[in-house]
């Protein structure tokens, strides 16, 4: 394929702060619907038998097979033998008239150089690189060159690329397809030819190896008058550039797009969006993959950070042309700290496996997730309080807070005390932000006894970190246990805050507060009932003297917003256990866990747990919080590092919205289905912070306007549901503490 370069000079629209217009004049919705992805337009990547290396697991998988789902097809690839599980395959080098077949890859000797490396993984694009390939001839003699294999997948394309230095001849074969050459050979297994043309004011090139158009964002430094991590003068910055897609053919096609940037990007928090020329969000998804990791003392690796790669697969109808604006939202959106959720590559850090990073604003991480639980056997990893200064005396605003991380979803140890790892953990990126993220995870226990689904959402806000968690566990086979938890705040090997007090309660107030015992690997209390509506748990009372560098002075907790469970064949309420660990002499931690009720010793097929939790984090030192929310500042001045902030959140956001038009699907975060006239009207009392409000069931993304107490809301997020073929819009509405909110979504057409 010829390497082509296309550039189109248009007026540069960078650093526009204009909101999407309240009166929308975009193209016809039927036309836009034809450009939206279908249910089959996706990719996923997962370890079939679970991650090969999970910290402190005695039951590693016997196979190291990856599953790559692309569109309606799958590839099972054995990463040990470096070959597909089935079918005809050849990966060989020919040097000095000897043929060497690939026999596998090198062993893992150092986590930094882990040879199976995930570069990008998301909704539209997967890239895995296997380094340190081993080759041998028929007599067992080894090839002494260095080679790597790259696997890439789009929904409509699968390709392998073999790279090796020197003059050796390279060969790849899959089925009836074969390629040969030197240096680098590309074997495309499935590839729907694209007739899409891409034009932009930005440089556009075609990447033959990746099968997509690359669109390079400007590499231009930002000003930073105060020398802060995120430049204060750019808090409300939004960048926009024009992109045009065209298809002159008589048949539909797909435009595969890759937006790239390496430098001068606030990499910890941003959201790319494809919008109409007037700034109206279209709902066309853009995958967010990025990396900031480097460890020069260990060496430099291909694909180490920093970089951002944004991927889109846009259907382009025949004989059509459409103008878009590619928009980058950074720290704030409409004056509210924006939410984002991205795949973060670990190449340059180590382990090189799956990692997700979510942020409110662009001031460092807010909460991270490690599908596979590789490094510290915890799914919930780094967690940081929002807009909270670290303890250093010269700390500045708009930068990284310290870490209060650690937590997990399902934890099961069998009757012999052996940790049961999870397998087939896969990620479904439904929305990257900037008003409300939506990412789902699915996995199951190694023997298929329990199927687990977890959904995490991060809302934009200006007060404190909230994370909405929705859990669903279905029992498929009988299980017994020495230890079973449906959720952990503070994991066994990741629990950064030495908090000394635990409290439980409900909407009415405090139920009980106590100081857990200081012990090692044993329970303090077991199966304490969480009674009453809006039950909550607070972990506070930070022992400052035990804080180490980088650990946050923060209190944490969670609210049980909804709970349904059948355990042992009977309806079961939530219960709490507190589990003690010790990280070195006298360095004690307490994990709080949701567990089965007392007396239940076995789960049977048909048992389940379904829960909605709200995880909250607060600064434990009032003076450290520098955010703009006056109500939170007053609360922390009185009650920081106590149970009261968690109770306030539980009661203050126990919303009871009433719908005059449309249907309430969920009270908090509020989800409203519009009526047949594409209209909704809802009233509610109170609330705290900014309330995420989502309207679903829209037949078009434009022609709507939200009135909040009669005033139009000017910033929103649009998402497309490919299963229902409908749009939804999400707003962040400032709460009326003690007051009333009237919300009306108007159909302006």
Question: Language-model segments: which ranges?
Answer:
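N-terminal secretory signal peptides that target proteins for export/translocation
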Residues: 1-9
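Bacterial N-terminal signal peptides
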Residues: 9-23
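Beta-strand-rich N-terminal accessory domains
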Residues: 27-97, 199-239, 247-251, 320-403
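Beta-strand-rich recognition/accessory modules
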Residues: 31, 182-214, 287-354, 527-665, ...
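Extracellular ectodomain segments of secreted/surface proteins
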Residues: 33-34, 204-259, 641-693
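Extended, loop-rich substrate-binding clefts of extracytoplasmic carbohydrate-active enzymes
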Residues: 60-62, 79-173, 179-184, 190, ...
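Non-catalytic C-terminal accessory modules of carbohydrate-active enzymes
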Residues: 109-114, 120, 128, 423-443, ...
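Polysaccharide-binding surfaces and accessory modules of carbohydrate-active proteins
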Residues: 166-245, 250, 258-278, 478-566
């Amino acid at each position: 394929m010829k390497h082509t370069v296309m550039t189109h000079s248009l007026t540069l629209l960078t650093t526009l702060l204009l909101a999407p217009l309240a009166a929308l004049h975009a193209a016809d919705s039927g036309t836009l619907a034809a450009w939206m992805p279908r249910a089959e337009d996706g990719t996923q990547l997962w370890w079939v038998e679970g991650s090969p290396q999970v910290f402190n697991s005695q039951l590693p998988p016997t196979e190291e097979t990856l599953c790559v789902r692309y569109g309606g097809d799958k590839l099972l690839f054995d990463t040990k033998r470096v070959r597909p599980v089935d079918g005809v395959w050849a990966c060989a080098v020919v040097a000095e008239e000897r043929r060497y077949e690939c026999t596998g890859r090198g062993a893992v000797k150092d986590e930094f150089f882990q040879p199976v490396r995930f570069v990008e993984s998301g909704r539209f694009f997967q890239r895995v690189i296997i380094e340190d390939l081993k080759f041998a001839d028929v007599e067992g003699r080894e090839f002494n060159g260095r080679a790597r294999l790259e696997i890439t997948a789009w929904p409509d394309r699968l390709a392998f690329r073999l790279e090796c230095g020197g003059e050796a001849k390279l060969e790849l074969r899959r089925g009836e397809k074969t390629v040969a050459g030197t240096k680098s050979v590309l074997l495309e297994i499935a590839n729907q030819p694209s007739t899409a043309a891409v034009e932009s004011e930005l440089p556009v090139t075609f990447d033959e190896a990746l099968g997509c158009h690359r669109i390079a964002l400007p590499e231009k430094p930002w000003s930073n008058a105060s020398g802060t991590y995120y430049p204060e003068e750019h808090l409300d910055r939004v960048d926009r550039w024009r992109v045009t897609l065209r298809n002159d053919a008589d048949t539909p096609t797909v435009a595969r797009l890759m937006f790239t940037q390496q430098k001068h990007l606030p990499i910890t928090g941003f959201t790319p969006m494809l919008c109409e020329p007037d700034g109206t969000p279209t709902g066309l998804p853009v995958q967010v993959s990025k990396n900031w990791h480097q460890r020069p003392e260990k060496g430099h690796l291909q694909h180490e950070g920093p970089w951002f790669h944004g991927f889109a697969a846009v259907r382009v109808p025949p004989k059509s042309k459409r103008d878009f604006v590619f928009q980058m939202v950074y720290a704030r959106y409409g004056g509210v700290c924006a939410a984002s959720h991205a795949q973060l590559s670990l190449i340059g850090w180590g382990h090189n496996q799956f990692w997700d990073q979510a942020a409110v604003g662009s001031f460092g991480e807010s909460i991270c997730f490690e599908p596979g639980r590789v490094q510290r056997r915890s799914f919930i990893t780094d967690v940081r309080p929002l807009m909270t200064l670290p303890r250093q005396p010269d700390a500045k605003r708009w930068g990284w807070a310290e870490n209060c991380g650690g937590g997990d979803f399902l934890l099961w140890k069998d009757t012999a005390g052996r940790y049961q790892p999870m397998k087939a953990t896969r990620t479904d990126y439904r929305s990257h932000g900037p008003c409300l993220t939506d990412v789902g995870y699915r996995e199951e226990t190694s023997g298929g006894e329990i199927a687990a689904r977890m959904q995490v959402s991060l809302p934009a806000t200006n007060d404190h970190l909230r994370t909405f968690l929705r859990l669903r566990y279905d029992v498929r086979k009988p299980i017994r246990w020495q230890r079973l938890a449906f959720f952990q705040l503070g994991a066994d090997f990741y629990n950064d805050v030495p908090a000394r007090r635990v409290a439980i309660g409900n909407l009415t107030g405090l139920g009980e507060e106590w100081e857990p015992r200081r012990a090692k690997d044993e329970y303090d209390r077991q199966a304490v009932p969480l009674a009453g509506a809006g039950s909550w748990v607070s972990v506070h009372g930070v022992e400052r003297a035990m804080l180490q560098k980088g650990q946050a002075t923060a209190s944490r907790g969670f609210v049980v917003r909804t709970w349904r469970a059948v355990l042992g064949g009977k309806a079961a309420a939530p219960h709490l256990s507190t589990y003690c660990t010790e990280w070195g002499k006298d360095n004690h931690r307490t994990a709080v866990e949701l567990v089965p009720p007392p007396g239940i010793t076995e789960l049977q097929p048909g048992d389940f747990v379904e829960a909605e939790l709200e995880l909250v984090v607060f600064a434990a030192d009032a003076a450290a919080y520098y955010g703009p929310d006056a109500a939170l500042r007053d609360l922390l001045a009185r009650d920081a590092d106590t149970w009261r902030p968690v109770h306030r959140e539980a009661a203050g956001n126990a919303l009871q919205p009433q719908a005059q038009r449309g249907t309430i699907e969920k009270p908090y975060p509020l989800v409203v289905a519009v009526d047949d006239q594409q209209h909704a009207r809802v009233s509610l009392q109170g609330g705290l912070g900014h309330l995420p409000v989502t309207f679903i069931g829209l037949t078009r993304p434009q022609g709507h306007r939200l009135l909040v107490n009669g005033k139009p809301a000017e910033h929103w997020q649009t998402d497309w549901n490919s299963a229902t073929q409908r749009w939804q819009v999400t707003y962040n509405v400032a709460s009326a503490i003690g007051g009333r909110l009237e919300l009306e979504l108007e159909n302006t057409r």
